[in-house]
Amino acid sequence: MVALTGESSTPIPDVDGVILTAPAVWGRPTMDLLPRLALWVGVRLMPGLTLTGRRLKIQPSDNIAMLRALAQDPMVIHATRIDTIYGLVNLMDAALASGARLDNPLFVMYGAKDEIIPREPIRRFVDTLPAEPSRRRKLAWYENGYHMLLRDLEGRVVIADVASWVLTPSAPLPSGADRTAGEAFLRAGSQVTVAGR
């Protein structure tokens, strides 16, 4: 997603398709005032302060064994500086704004139980996608999916859908997650149509 936003110094790659799993598009335009204000103040007054998500009571996956392993992994970042979070939000701003430029074949996946990226930013991102050609776009909504869709307990279902889309993008997904995606993703009056329905 970084390369596709144009924010990277890396040239935008010539790719056959783009797969976005729970895309990080929670940019400032979709945030409430309080988080935006807290980030603005924090990056100016305490940019080096580190924060953890321990007290947030957010569950990124239903795969508890995997989450416990990540908690013990020394290679996983467990505390993040405020200035790093600020940079991440800048990147999410760019990602949210990049939807209108994504004319590659696209597969967007999102879990109904995602507690990291709210549904509204995903809806806004999907709503900005080019209206045509809709046949090159597939949206998938996983009723039992969390943020870490590929590592969730039903991750094999998601992986099978990814494999199906890579091999035959126009075919319906084996899980059927594309059949309910339209109602879950799109706003009333959206110009975007959903392929595979």
Protein language model regions, located:
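Short, conserved loop/helix-junction motifs that constitute active-site signature segments
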Residues: 12-13, 99-103, 129-133
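Short alpha-helix in the alpha/beta-hydrolase fold that links the catalytic acid
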Residues: 104, 118-128, 155
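Short beta-strand/loop motif that positions the catalytic acidic residue
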Residues: 102, 108-110, 114
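Acidic catalytic loop of the alpha/beta-hydrolase fold
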Residues: 78, 113-117, 125, 148
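Catalytic active-site module of serine/aspartate enzymes centered on a nucleophile-bearing elbow/loop
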Residues: 136-197
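Active-site nucleophile elbow and catalytic-triad environment of alpha/beta-hydrolase enzymes
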Residues: 80-98
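Hydrophobic/aromatic beta-strand patches that form the interior of the parallel beta-sheet core
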Residues: 19, 107-109, 140
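Alpha/beta-hydrolase-fold enzymes
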Residues: 1-81
